[in-house]
Amino acid sequence: MTTSLLLHPRWPESLMYVYEDSAAESGSGGGGGGGGAGGAGGGCSGASPGKAPSMDGLGGSCPASHCRDLLPHPVLARPPAPLGAPQGAVYTDIPAPEAARQCAPPPAPPTSSSATLGYGYPFGGSYYGCRLSHNVNLQQKPCAYHPGDKYPEPSGALPGDDLSSRAKEFAFYPSFASSYQAMPGYLDVSVVPGISGHPEPRHDALIPVEGYQHWALSNGWDSQVYCSKEQSQSAHLWKSPFPDVVPLQPEVSSYRRGRKKRVPYTKVQLKELEKEYAASKFITKEKRRRISATTNLSERQVTIWFQNRRVKEKKVVSKSKAPHLHST
């Protein structure tokens, strides 16, 4: 069936939408005169093409699945003025019953038409919308297709489930210890989205830090620094103030506390120290520097060795004198 809709050129710009509804609500409308229709009524694809292009009596006899309601703009609801010669027409082709659920955009009218109409087809989750204006020398604009997922129906339910799932993604806060497990060598950063931020979550909750080290001693605890006696001492606590003096082993870190393990001197070092002690029991500053350079020991080590050597000799002398005093 081909229906002709005629609009007066003095009417303002209007929009008309097509909504799918039951047959009982599609009977409103007014009949047109000999030249066209002044209102909008129900249309059905089962009507015979031999009827006159009038819109009277088209509602009520059509099934609910094939009927469409033409809801006019509020401007169109006022009584129309008498129409003169038709200024233009828009032809809407209604397809066969098997294709009633899918409507193609209407064909473009002749170039001589000056009165056009705006309408839309919400079929199958999609929306065909046309906005046409009533100008004398303006042709009809092509219809634009809007997918249903981009322009959802306003009657649909709000995406509450989607919002709740998004809220679960931002549940990583420092106070929630059960959300994740802390890893050594990483800092925990909360992922709280801002008001104007991107809605997608950022997966950067763990940021590596180069200078951070997690000290885990094999013979102690993480909360305490413990140094057992079985550990081998790998460095000395004394360092030579001269750049040319190289210590035997690298200096130990200051975080290890406790008594260091005794490191015996080598035979070459002991021989050099005994020779200098035989020459003089007390050393000067120049002599201490020279012994430190030759024995590869620090000046503090040389000084302490001479002190210990004098105490040892004093003990030996005192022990040797003790039996002699008791005998007398």
From Swiss-Prot:
Q: Where in the cell is it found?
A: Nucleus
GO CC, alphabetical = nucleus
- UniProt signal peptide: none
The terms under GO molecular function for this entry are: chromatin binding; DNA-binding transcription activator activity, RNA polymerase II-specific; DNA-binding transcription factor binding; transcription cis-regulatory region binding
Q: Does the keyword Nucleus apply?
A: yes
Give the UniProt record's GO annotations in the biological process aspect. Answer: anatomical structure morphogenesis; anterior/posterior pattern specification; hair follicle development; nail development; positive regulation of transcription by RNA polymerase II; tongue morphogenesis
The family database entries (SUPFAM superfamilies) matched by this protein are listed as: Homeodomain-like
Reported tissue expression: Expressed in differentiating keratinocytes. In the hair follicle lower matrix, expressed in all 3 hair shaft-forming compartments, i.e. cuticle, cortex and medulla. Expression stops sharply at the boundary with the germinal matrix compartment.
Q: Which domain of life is it from?
A: Eukaryota
**Biased composition range(s): Gly residues:** 27-45
Keywords (A to Z) from UniProt: Developmental protein, DNA-binding, Homeobox, Nucleus, Transcription, Transcription regulation
Functionally, this protein is described as follows: Transcription factor which plays a role in hair follicle differentiation. Regulates FOXQ1 expression and that of other hair-specific genes.
Q: Which family does it belong to?
A: Belongs to the Abd-B homeobox family.
Identification of the protein by name: Homeobox protein Hox-C13
Question: What species is this protein from?
Answer: Mus musculus (Mouse)
